[in-house]
Amino acid sequence: MSEEVAVDSMEYDVVVVGGGPAGLSTAIKLKQLAAENNSELSVCLIEKGSEIGAHILSGNCFEPTALDELIPDWKEKGAPLNTPAKKDIVKFFLTEKLSFGIPFASFFAPNFNNHGNYVMSLANFCRWLATQAENLGVEIFLASQHQKLFTKTIQ
C-alpha cells in the first residue's frame, strides 16, 4: 500500500535563497523597483539558519557606498553602523599576548584606506537588513530546508 504525502506549496514571483547581505539586498531592491513601477511583486527569502545572521561569524570594516544607494536614509532608519573607522594600523602578533602595531600608510595602497568606513558586526547588519526587507513586504522563512523548487518561465 502506498501512502501519499501532503506537500505544502507556496507561490511567489521571486524566491531569494540565503539571508546574507547579498540575498537581503536583492530582495530589498526587487521590492523597491516594483514599488517604483507601481507593480505587485511577491518576494520571499529562505534562510537555512535559525535566525538571520546565524551563519555570519565575522566582523567587518564596511564601506557604505552601496548602502547609500540601496537605502539612502539608512542613518535615520538606525542601521547598526555606529563605530567609524578612525585609523588604519597593521598589527603584528609575535605571540598570543605580544604584539605591536605600525600605522598603515594608505598612500601605498589606497584601497585599504578605511576613512569613512565603519567597523561593525555583519550579523547585526544582516538582521537590520532583514527588518528593512520585511518592512517592504518581503516574507522571510527561517530554518528552511526545501526539497524542491518549482520554476515557471513567464513569456
Per-segment meaning from a language model:
Residues 13-44:
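N-terminal Rossmann-like FAD-binding beta1-loop-alpha1 element of flavoenzymes
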Residues 81-155:
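Feature captures the FAD/FMN-dependent oxidoreductase FAD-binding
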Residues 19, 47-49, 142-144:
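Glycine-rich, histidine-containing beta strand-loop boundary motifs that form or position
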Residues 30-32, 58-61, 105:
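Short, glycine/charged-enriched secondary-structure capping and boundary segments
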Residues 12, 18, 22, 26, ...:
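Catalytic cores of large soluble enzymes that bind and process phosphate-bearing ligands
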Residues 40, 48-97:
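N-terminal FAD cofactor-binding segment of flavoenzymes
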Residues 1-11:
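A short, basic/flexible loop-to-alpha-helix module at the beginning of a structural domain
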